[in-house]
């Protein structure tokens, strides 16, 4: 177990599930949502046998995937996307902070949804 992290419990699954149920009409937004879903939450819920409480994958929105349809950037990490959106980036050299990353992803999501999709001709070689 990493320093500073407590072991995920059945109670943690219950609390998160209740919270997400209260806001069931809202998406769950993350940058690299597939990683957060599969490597973090799916594993945590599975480890304590509460998989049925995990929110469905259809609720998730990935700001990295969304950014690729809206912005032409050399890289699509959270810092690059924040910069591409003209939003305040995370402080360089600071350790990863999940709460700050979640706030940044939410701001990116809201901003990207105001932008039109790139035209196919703007997508670059990877779409050909």
Language model: regions and residue ranges:
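Metal-dependent phosphoesterase signature
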Residues: 1-19
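Metal-dependent phosphoesterase core characteristic of DEDDh/y 3'-5' exonuclease domains
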Residues: 1-3, 20-128
């Amino acid at each position: 177990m990493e320093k500073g992290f407590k072991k995920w419990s059945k109670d943690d699954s219950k609390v998160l599930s209740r919270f997400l149920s209260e806001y069931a009409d809202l998406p769950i937004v993350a940058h690299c949502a597939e990683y957060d879903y599969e490597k973090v939450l799916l594993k945590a819920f599975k480890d304590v046998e509460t998989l049925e409480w995990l929110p469905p994958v259809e609720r998730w929105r990935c700001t990295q995937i969304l950014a690729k349809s809206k912005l032409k950037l050399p890289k699509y990490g959270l810092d690059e996307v924040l910069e591409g959106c003209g939003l305040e980036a995370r402080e360089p050299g600071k350790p990863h902070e999940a709460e700050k990353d979640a706030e940044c992803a939410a701001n990116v999501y809201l901003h990207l949804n105001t932008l039109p999709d790139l035209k196919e001709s703007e997508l670059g070689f990877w779409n050909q």
